[in-house]
Amino acid sequence: MDRVYALYPRYDEKGLELIRSAYGIASVALKDMTRSNGQPFIEHPDAVARIAYEEIGLSAECIAAIYLHEASRFFPETDIASGKFGKDVYTIVDGLNKISTINPKDTRLEAENYKKLIVSYSRDPRVTILKIADRLEVMRSLDIFPKLSRERKVLETMMLYIPLAHQLGLYNIKSEMEDIYFRHADPEQ
């Protein structure tokens, strides 16, 4: 049994092949990258994909888009346009890549304007949902980040991602992000 089938048994063979191809591209592109804790960076899209699959129930196209987004975000020259992924996947990757270029600190946007910008860059609602799944993974991994980065991520989550999760009906994710926020915002409690 292969790794992709073991992780995503609900998908048909076409979906599994899509994920295998995307994972293959990402694992090559990200092979030398590590997270703040020294672990391979590929663990981040793996964890986001598990959230998207297990907790939200998104399609194989969304799982493939997670891997392709991470590969093309860091390495724009990564060839994901070979035609085998389809328009849906490319639309999602494009939306995720556009959102990743927005930095609320740089643009000095108010939270509401930033949320509107995220939604406007996400012509497809799956893009926003995947961005929330990504943020949940970041929140679950907060301890690997330096203190200032952690504080910024916690604040962004409270101001931006928790309200978005609520608006989209992702109540379990919203609640978990709130719990993590309160643990980190006021660790004495």
Q: What does each model-found stretch correspond to?
A:
Residues M1-Q189:
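Active-site helical microenvironments for divalent-metal-assisted chemistry
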